[in-house]
Amino acid sequence: MQDFVPNSSYTREELIACGNGELFGPGNAQLPVPNMLMLDRIAHISTTGGEYGKGEIIAELDIHKDLWFFGCHFPGDPVMPGCLGLDAMWQLVGFFLAWKGNPGRGRALGSGEVKFTGQILPTAKQVTYHIHLKRVIERKLIMGIADGRVAVDGKEIYFAKDLRVGLFSNTDTF
């Protein structure tokens, strides 16, 4: 495996490689693989910018009617589960921590307020995730705290405050 060199954007293939442990190296953060990978691309990632000036990520998921969750949630009334959008935001905070060069496996640690004000239907075209890093702790504890927004076809529909993700060198007792 080659040494990791951070990019400012990532393709679906690169995100799947991350899920297979090929991006950040063995024992380090991984994204889920399909079907739980809720991203098709990271359009932009930076240690600057965002609402707090501490970093941001913009990622996208292309929507099509044959996505796995539409067939079971709910029959006759298909909608993307809101928890999958929330999980995508946690996925992105963990990715950010590893992208900055921090070691360890990512685990979601919680969030503050979460609001759902809309839905993602199979007729939608694209979901956009926008993560605004508020704080990045890089000591013995490696943790990111961020606010996130989810939009469908340009309309904001979810908001999460204080998303927390940590990276751990040992998850045996987690």
From Swiss-Prot:
EC number(s) reported in the record: 4.2.1.59, 5.3.3.14
Keyword entries, A-Z: Cytoplasm, Fatty acid biosynthesis, Fatty acid metabolism, Isomerase, Lipid biosynthesis, Lipid metabolism, Lyase
Highest taxon in the source lineage: Bacteria
Entry keyword annotation includes Secreted: no
Protein name: 3-hydroxydecanoyl-[acyl-carrier-protein] dehydratase
Role of this protein: Necessary for the introduction of cis unsaturation into fatty acids. Catalyzes the dehydration of (3R)-3-hydroxydecanoyl-ACP to E-(2)-decenoyl-ACP and then its isomerization to Z-(3)-decenoyl-ACP. Can catalyze the dehydratase reaction for beta-hydroxyacyl-ACPs with saturated chain lengths up to 16:0, being most active on intermediate chain length.
Subunit structure of this chain's protein: Homodimer.
Subcellular localization: Cytoplasm
A cellular component term, taken from the record's GO annotations: cytoplasm
Entry's Gene Ontology BP terms: unsaturated fatty acid biosynthetic process
Active site: H73
Main location: cytoplasm
Chain ranges passing through the membrane: none
Similarity comment: Belongs to the thioester dehydratase family. FabA subfamily.
Biochemical pathway: Lipid metabolism; fatty acid biosynthesis
UniProt cross-references to InterPro entries, sorted A to Z: FabA, FabA_FabZ, HotDog_dom_sf
Recorded GO MF terms: (3R)-hydroxyacyl-[acyl-carrier-protein] dehydratase activity; trans-2-decenoyl-acyl-carrier-protein isomerase activity
Catalytic reaction(s) noted: a (3R)-hydroxyacyl-[ACP] = a (2E)-enoyl-[ACP] + H2O; (3R)-hydroxydecanoyl-[ACP] = (2E)-decenoyl-[ACP] + H2O; (2E)-decenoyl-[ACP] = (3Z)-decenoyl-[ACP]
Source organism per UniProt: Teredinibacter turnerae (strain ATCC 39867 / T7901)
